[in-house]
Amino acid sequence: MKPIIPPQNLSELLERANMMAGISLAQIAAHRGIAVPKDLKRDKGWVGQLIEMELGATAGSKPEQDFLHLGVELKTIPIDSKGKPLETTYVCVAPLTNIEGLTWQDSLVCHKLQRVLWVPVEGERHIPVGDRRVGTPILWEPDLQEQRLLQQDWEEIMELIALGKVEKLTARHGEVLQLRPKAANSKALTQSIAEDGSLKMTNPRGFYLKTAFTAMLLNKVFG
């Protein structure tokens, strides 16, 4: 199957996303000639990759927005029957070294969350993967209050990383943004700042949006 040409503009992207609303993942996968996994235990990113492919996203795993030419990040969000998010939303890998002078405005979190196309997808486990339907997409830009909350959490987390306290950061830190170990394999290691300012090895960390925050975003649109 030929890769889909990236959308030329925002209205084309939204048109593609709206055309998926109400369609099952099996229908999209069949159209792309892709097998549907029995479950997502070993294919956690499968839904997101399928939606990326269908919409013509270009970034892949690169540290930039999925539709860089449009300034849009794509996020699929698994929801329950009441439209509530079922899990936190991964944003990006957290930098653990060389962070002196890094500001919120220059951070990858800020860059990725400037404009997000949220694509809700049914995610309850009793629904077979292929039968799960895609919901109505939402194009979101953080308002001043949301920006403030995100920036505040990011700055507090980064300050603790700079002080060598990354191990003391738990998923409970942050009102809307949290830091968690990223690697599926707990043996994966990367460098981070130690409390004495030297470098030490630790598990890679990622930034995630808490479900209370994404639930608030969905609720603003769907009520």
From Swiss-Prot:
SUPFAM superfamilies: Restriction endonuclease-like
S-S bonds: none
Subcellular localization(s) per the UniProt record: Cytoplasm
InterPro entries xref list: DNA_mismatch_repair_MutH (IPR004230), DNA_rep_MutH/RE_typeII_Sau3AI (IPR011337), DNA_rep_MutH/T2_RE_sf (IPR037057), Restrct_endonuc-II-like (IPR011335)
SMART domains named in the record: MutH
Main localization, broad class: cytoplasm
Any one Gene Ontology molecular-function term assigned to this protein's record: DNA binding
Keyword Hydrolase: yes
GO cellular component assignments: cytoplasm
Record's keyword terms, sorted: Cytoplasm, DNA damage, DNA repair, Endonuclease, Hydrolase, Nuclease
Biological-process GO terms, alphabetical: DNA modification; mismatch repair
Function: Sequence-specific endonuclease that cleaves unmethylated GATC sequences. It is involved in DNA mismatch repair.
UniProt-listed HAMAP family: MutH
Protein family (similarity comment): Belongs to the MutH family.
Protein name: DNA mismatch repair protein MutH
Organism: Shewanella sp. (strain ANA-3)
